[in-house]
Amino acid sequence: MALKKYNPTTPGQRQLVLVDRSALYKGKPVKSLTEGKISNGGRNNTGRITVRFRGGGHKQTYRIVDFKRTKVDVPAKVERLEYDPNRTAFIALIKYEDGEQAYILAPQRLSVGDSVIAGSYVDVKPGNVMPLGNMPVGTIVHNIELKIGKGGQIARSAGTYAQLVGRDHDYVIVRLNSGEQRLVHGRCTATIGAVSNPDHMNISIGKAGRKRWLGRRPHNRGVVMNPIDHPHGGGEGRTSGGRHPVTPWGKPTKGKKTRSNKSTDKFILISRHKRKKK
């Protein structure tokens, strides 16, 4: 879908660039595939802020998206493509031959009326699901499982994808958008194709109020706060902080490595950080 620019009738309109969603379904979502969503404004169950700069925004309904695709060898037809306020990608409503409906992530080049299917050996076309071990090398995939049967976790945002670049016994080698190459078990499934809405990265919000509609509050730097609020706070006049950048809780930021998941390090063949050094 193309980008949509607006005439500069106001300062906010002048900068505004959005994705043209005119081809999407304009009605309400399927009620049986939705849930209520409570806005917590970044607070946890004790009322304390656990995520800063969140709050407000338009009320949203959560769409239950099927990331597992466990209905095997049952063809489904794409009924319509829809907007989903909970994610950057578009979603597709599919209807199986037995009448069951489900939402899936819409891949690029998937149209209304297309047929999709999940199985061990299916056609390599957008929207179909099969185990990574059965796919030909070079296939573009998204919604990749990391644990067998858990459902897709990798490459789910708008425009993202990964590429199957090799095999290693029971595992396959997958190259991610970040440049990282990692091993994934061959029995883990993935959906063929790249995720829809690749133009999402090119949108321009246009004004602060549009961020508020999305539930994002103003973000304040540490150096403009008081010492009680941030390690960089305080000082007479404008100061640079006087120490290496840290989080509000004193942990080093801006480049310090924080990954400590040693149990899965063996699955990462090429780190995304190594790619940047070349």
From Swiss-Prot:
Q: Return the Pfam families for the record.
A: Ribosomal_L2 (PF00181), Ribosomal_L2_C (PF03947)
Which segments carry the region annotation Disordered?
Answer: 222-278
| GO BP terms in the entry | cytoplasmic translation
What GO CC annotations are associated with the protein? large ribosomal subunit
**Listed Gene3D superfamilies:** 2.30.30.30, Nucleic acid-binding proteins, Ribosomal protein L2, domain 3
Q: Name one GO molecular function term.
A: rRNA binding
Question: What superkingdom does the record give?
Answer: Bacteria
Task: Please report the name of this protein according to its UniProt entry.
Answer: Large ribosomal subunit protein uL2
Q: Which organism is it from?
A: Rhodopseudomonas palustris (strain BisB5)
